[in-house]
Amino acid sequence: MKIIHTADWHLGKILNGKQLLEDQAYILDMFVEKMKEEEPDIIVIAGDLYDTTYPSKDAIMLLEQAIGKLNLELRIPIIMISGNHDGKERLNYGASWFEHNQLFIRTDFTSINSPIEINGVNFYTLPYATVSEMKHYFEDDTIETHQQGITRCIETIAPEIDEDAVNILISHLTVQGGKTSDSERPLTIGTVESVQKGVFDIFDYVMLGHLHHPFSIEDDKIKYSGSLLQYSFSEAGQAKGYRRLTINDGIINDVFIPLKPLRQLEIISGEYNDVINEKVHVKNKDNYLHFKLKNMSHITDPMMSLKQIYPNTLALTNETFNYNEENNAIEISEKDDMSIIEMFYKHITDKELSDIQSKKIKNILENELRKED
């Protein structure tokens, strides 16, 4: 049996004001073409199909087109669950009709009680749920963390699980120790959101969404597929794609398959003048770029100048702000007022105070000292 594991499409994502629908349409077309080659028995999408609870019309159309090609044209069964970004009601609309074509949409965490059996494999679905939802459902005020809530959900099905079959869990959550990125919205506020690996011991394999790095966690049977695209500059350089899972005689193997996007996220560090004069290596001018530059404080609008050469510049950082990060041994308390001002001015402008500026500042400081006396 061959299973494809994907997640975190985040359709409708806007990165630093840039709409990514073109990039998402490109990567989904590539994914569909890959599925024609793979001919899987089933595709699993582990949450966060959309980036917002209220996706745009274009984002909805993009999902419909991709799912239509995969499920209706290629006749591939699909299981999809909701993530913390998805609007459950919108994603679940028409779910009962779609099951006639083996498109299984699960948005309620209680669906874990109703596994989907395909080719002798039991797929248990555990969509994203808040701690309060689980606490209310179980009428248990002692549930205060995701660890406690998820444990309770799995305990409810443990007595019924068929130990002679292959049992796979599909969920959207954070496993303890998983590597996070800036584009992942925290699952909870004020409670512990990560879940320990041991909670999943009764399953033969666990397919997860939420964390965007495909190797967020090192484990033989607990895997994240990662997102289809890089969605924050903290993900620059990360491979993106999907996982192929094969089951032969009860033995499970998986491999990560990378996909090449239309554009990647790239971080460029250097001197402003070198970048403007194109003396700094950029992999692809069409990539989405974050420049971290020095010596640009004298430039009125550096972002505009950069975009004339690199149209997809999405972020710009003045590296002088990090001037002392590697030299934080300097104790400000040991400096006099004038020295602190000189350091600050140099830190911000990368220039020394002029004689006139120094004299004016000294006069101001002296006047303030007289007032204190």
From Swiss-Prot:
Belongs to the SbcD family. This is Nuclease SbcCD subunit D. GO terms for biological process: DNA recombination; DNA replication. The gene is sbcD. SbcCD cleaves DNA hairpin structures. These structures can inhibit DNA replication and are intermediates in certain DNA recombination reactions. The complex acts as a 3'->5' double strand exonuclease that can open hairpins. It also has a 5' single-strand endonuclease activity. Keywords: DNA recombination, DNA replication, Endonuclease, Exonuclease, Hydrolase, Nuclease. It comes from Staphylococcus aureus (strain Mu50 / ATCC 700699). The lineage of its organism: Bacteria, Bacillati, Bacillota, Bacilli, Bacillales. It holds the Pfam family Metallophos. GO terms for molecular function: 3'-5' exonuclease activity; endonuclease activity. Gene3D superfamilies: 3.60.21.10. InterPro entries: Calcineurin-like_PHP_ApaH, DNA_Repair-Maintenance_Comp, Metallo-depent_PP-like, Mre11_N, SbcCD_nuclease, SbcD, SbcD_C. The keyword Hydrolase applies. PANTHER family: COMPONENT OF ATP-DEPENDENT DSDNA EXONUCLEASE, NUCLEASE SBCCD SUBUNIT D. Heterodimer of SbcC and SbcD. The keyword Oxidoreductase does not apply.
